[in-house]
Amino acid sequence: RDRQVGAEEISAGIRRFIIGLSKKMLIANVMAVAVDKMFALDMAQLDTASAWVGAVCYLFQIYFDFSGYSDMAVGMGKMFGFTFPENFDYPYTASSVRQFWKKWHISLTSWFREYLYFPLGGNRKGKARTLFNRFFVFLCTGIWHGANWTFVVWGIYHGLLTMLETALVKEKKPRSNENAAEALIDNQPAKKNVFLSIAGHVYTLLAVTIG
């Protein structure tokens, strides 16, 4: 199919590229300075407050770094007539770890879903098999990130969290792409909705920061 590239597409691509470059240069790189200083400290020098500051800075560094590169790729594609899929969907607004992984590094999670999770049976072969499939996918995701025991532990950590959420949250029959946490919240009174939403966001941010 012939690609159509006009002034509007080029302008949109340039804007998106500049946004991505700004994320990388003005936020991610600045955060990286603080993160490097914190990570360079000995355990004896690192107090609780400094550890949390370093963890939060790293949380923002990795997001603005990676999403910045993704924005630049999307913008560059627009300039040449390509439409690349979005790779991030405001992941830090998620109210569960499962929802977080629907919003973070979407290209990677989509690949694992299509070529590993679904072929393993997805959620079609009972609760126990679903739990195993989710855990195994995250274990493989950890190994994909690097052949190091830290990445294996990372994969196990997120695999266990998604297993726990799947096991504990009572799911309704899905309406479109609704996830389990959203289904649970939809069934609660208004005041509980607010509480559960805030609690879900806090839990997810803590879980992602730690892991």
Could you describe each region identified by the protein language model?
Residues 1-211:
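Membrane-embedded transmembrane alpha-helical bundles that form the catalytic cores
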